[in-house]
């Protein structure tokens, strides 16, 4: 500590607390009460037998930590994998939303969005957020970064060729007609498909390279690098995995304003319509906010980004949406059936 200035030391501490809060938020959403560990674990000190801490106490610690992070992280654009102030603001909004603290989210998100020093903005290329234009992208607020061939993942192989997860019919049906995000999110029959060695198209019998059939006749395009050959995809994938982006913050703000009784505020509607009206998407503006509109916009805008699961939990709609998930227009998926993971 003596080797650094107060600002430098607290910035490093803020990054560490941001990450601890990030992972505890994942645990709390999944498990509720979890063991809260605030000191380094050592062999023989019984850390493996630590009892679960009440959820409310864990959340209180998370909010204390993230407030420290917001104070000491720099308010600059996100570039190099290090959390910045905007990253911490998004994380705090997510924590507060999980507890239905809508007024607090509306205030926090609104203050940041409308701050003239806010360094973030919507990207002018929706598809580029996930492949091709990730470096210094103004919309990305936090991501897991990779650089092949030394630091890589296998997403192109597992999603782009083997299709270990694919879109449901319900997800496809949730898009409005002519929404260009459809083609930027998923492959449909007849689309160019690099893994079909015969026709080069995505066809009804699916992936010719691996011989696996997508039941929905859909496959995800987000994060897929069309230039990586299937045999090499396990070692060349280095797309950054986006965990937070500005569109999510805008939609959280719109939702929080609506749920806190401020849905008639023009700024709330503008936040949602800004997402819909980004260059390259240009979907018609919505004349007013409704719960259905907000929730569906989150579903399509953030599809296959790991957000929908948490939205289903905090909205308490699993009992409504899970039993109705469909492979296609006719076939319901029964929960007891062994199946490939499917994104709803």
Walk through the language-model features, giving the residues of each.
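Acidic/polar-rich alpha-helix caps and helix-coil junctions
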Residues: 1-156, 180-336, 340
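A low-complexity, Ser/Thr/Gly/Pro-enriched, surface-exposed linker/loop concept
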Residues: 156-162
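An acidic, gly/pro-interrupted, aromatic-rich
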Residues: 164-186
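N-terminal low-complexity segments that are often proline-rich with Ser/Thr-Pro
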Residues: 342-344
